[in-house]
Amino acid sequence: MTAPLTLALSKGRIFEETLPLLAAAGVQVTEDPETSRKLILPTTNPDLRVIIVRASDVPTYVEYGAADFGVAGKDVLVEHGGSGLYQPIDLNIARCRMSVAVSAGFDYASAVRQGARLRVATKYVETAREHFAAKGVHVDLIKLYGSMELAPLVGLADAIVDLVSSGGTLKANNLVEVEEIMAISSRLVVNQAALKLKRTALKPILDAFERASQNGG
């Protein structure tokens, strides 16, 4: 008996916005990860199951073949490096941007011009390092895992690098966006070995995802 295909998803926005793409492939997830304690969820297709993992772990599960394919944000993929992954489709879901933000009273442009060494808090350390190095800005990077907006407010950092959607959270914490690093959307990633060995099973799903993403879901 052939093992089912495994799709790695994270809870929240990516999961919710992937559901219409699965529906386009004729598949529905039969349990809600927000209410179920299960981490392996069945679908209406007996040959496809969904596993729920942390967003930052999706590329790792796919890279090592624990999942055949997954959906991950560009932010996560850039930080991961993308090794061992085939990235065929930008799904155009979970769109936002990665930006530099500072306290409203901090003159970021002046600090950069004067060559000041800035402390920057972020969970995207590699991406931030590359960005500031390319601009010739001297930074000390502080790795955080959440509540980035707090760092400038309590003097931990001069700036943060984080994802911004509406900007409402920044505004609520008296922070301003000063620089956009990149536009973010979620991509389909496929294990390279699975693409070869399970191509017949994978291709109809990948094709349906691509059509749905081009048509806006």
From Swiss-Prot:
Its main location: cytoplasm. Pathway: Amino-acid biosynthesis; L-histidine biosynthesis; L-histidine from 5-phospho-alpha-D-ribose 1-diphosphate: step 1/9. One of its GO terms (biological process) is L-histidine biosynthetic process. Its EC number is 2.4.2.17. It is an enzyme of class 2 (transferase). Keywords: Amino-acid biosynthesis, ATP-binding, Cytoplasm, Glycosyltransferase, Histidine biosynthesis, Nucleotide-binding, Transferase. GO terms for molecular function: ATP binding; ATP phosphoribosyltransferase activity. Gene3D superfamilies: Periplasmic binding protein-like II. Pfam families: HisG. SUPFAM superfamilies: Periplasmic binding protein-like II. NCBIfam families: hisG. Catalyzes the condensation of ATP and 5-phosphoribose 1-diphosphate to form N'-(5'-phosphoribosyl)-ATP (PR-ATP). Has a crucial role in the pathway because the rate of histidine biosynthesis seems to be controlled primarily by regulation of HisG enzymatic activity. HAMAP family: HisG_Short. Belongs to the ATP phosphoribosyltransferase family. Short subfamily. Heteromultimer composed of HisG and HisZ subunits. Lacks the C-terminal regulatory region which is replaced by HisZ. This is ATP phosphoribosyltransferase. It comes from Burkholderia lata (strain ATCC 17760 / DSM 23089 / LMG 22485 / NCIMB 9086 / R18194 / 383). The gene is hisG.
